[in-house]
Amino acid sequence: MHEYPVVLVINSGSSSIKFSVLDAQRCEVLLAGIAEGINSGSATLSVNGAAPVALAQRGYEPALAAICAELEKRSLIDSVALIGHRVAHGGNLFQQSAIVDDEVMEKIRRISPLAPLHNYANLSGMVSARHLFPGVTQVAVFDTSFHQTLAPEAWLYALPYRYAQEYGVRRYGFHGTSHRYVSQRAHHLLGLSEADSGLVIAHLGNGASICAVRNGRSVDTSMGMTPLEGLMMGTRSGDVDFGALAWIASQTGQSIADLEQMVNTESGLLGISGLSSDLRVLERAQREGHQRADLAIRTFVHRIARHIGGHAASLRRLDGIIFTGGIGENSALIRRMVLEHLSVFGITLAPDKNNMPGSAGERIISGEDSAVICAVIPTDEERMIALDALRLGKIMPSIEYA
């Protein structure tokens, strides 16, 4: 048994379960891995980056049982005091994380049509964890809850109001757990009072979003009712004129389902470049003179800068611009190009700081004379989920959120 209690963090997807085990004392990761293909005949489990091992049975519970076996091998199973679950969509029913009970699970089930690929999988993880860890407190942490502080003028779509009332059609926003964690770290790094501050956070990865955080609260965000709206992404289009989609349908005969697939899986960096959704591949291709890779990168940057500028308008003042996510943390090129676009804000860059590798971690990358502080802060959604579980489970770690 481990010296301190541990928190098991679970992210149940449509075909996978990602997990990590964190020490409740310091919230440090002790173990992490992923079970993939869990609904197929070729399910595997990889722990701490080791080669995948085939699983005998398919399904959520057998996969979680295999994860339990790995914990048992390391004498961690009896130390699991709390389980934290990432839940994709909390609708407007969850303003914050919640202890999982029958009522909470029923509410999640009720709003699952808003995110059918994710929420039902999240529920399957909760049900399986209940069977395998009877009596252990579970906590649901919602990707949308941080954005429940948006004012109506920020979350409403300019459609007939009845669609919001009757069908829940509105902006919900996503990446909330990441934006919340990074905003808390940013107040610490930049020496700001959470109660009097203005930040724009750019979470840039295969999925990407912008969030305006005023006095510690989300006041605007780029993703909408689904994660499709806003920035151009790896394979998602981001903002597109609906009239353009209607025109495509009229010319090609494609259905709504066809168009939905196209804007979700065939667009973005992949769609423009015709090469890849992976920015690392596109940066290499750009250096080799690939014109459409260059065009994809420039379009990506333009959209990011435009959204950062627009989100700054939701703040009373702009103290900091923060980059996070796989691209935000690791691409010096994208950060430089975005901040060059934002020179209207009086931003200057410190190239030596910007060009450091992602492993350099948290750092300020703006110049000393910059009117706005710009920084890189690695996100840590697993830690945020674990901290929420510890807070609600009343097991306080020796570290604070920031």
Curated annotation (Swiss-Prot):
Metal-binding is among the record's keywords: yes
Any one biological process term the GO annotation gives: acetate metabolic process
Catalytic activity reported: propanoate + ATP = propanoyl phosphate + ADP
Chain positions of site Transition state stabilizer: 175, 236
Pathway: Amino-acid degradation; L-threonine degradation via propanoate pathway; propanoate from L-threonine: step 4/4
Keywords for this protein: ATP-binding, Kinase, Magnesium, Metal-binding, Nucleotide-binding, Transferase
CDD domains reported in the protein's UniProt record: ASKHA_NBD_AcK_PK
Keyword Transferase in annotation: yes
The organism's place on the tree of life at top rank: Bacteria
EC number: 2.7.2.15
Record-listed substrate binding positions: 86
Positions annotated to bind Mg(2+): 11
Enzyme class: transferase
GO CC, one annotated term: cytosol
GO molecular function, one term: acetate kinase activity
Cofactor(s) needed by this chain: Mg(2+)
Binding-site list for ATP: 11, 18, 175, 203-207, 278-280, 326-330
InterPro entries hit by this protein: Ac/propionate_kinase, Aliphatic_acid_kin_short-chain, Aliphatic_acid_kinase_CS, ATPase_NBD, Propionate_kinase
Positions annotated as active site in the UniProt record: 143 (proton donor/acceptor)
Subunit structure: Homodimer.
Role: Catalyzes the conversion of propionyl phosphate and ADP to propionate and ATP.
Family to which this protein belongs: Belongs to the acetokinase family. TdcD subfamily.
NCBIfam families the UniProt entry points to: ackA, PRK12379.1
The protein's name: Propionate kinase
Source organism of this protein record: Edwardsiella piscicida
Organism taxonomic ancestry: Bacteria, Pseudomonadati, Pseudomonadota, Gammaproteobacteria, Enterobacterales
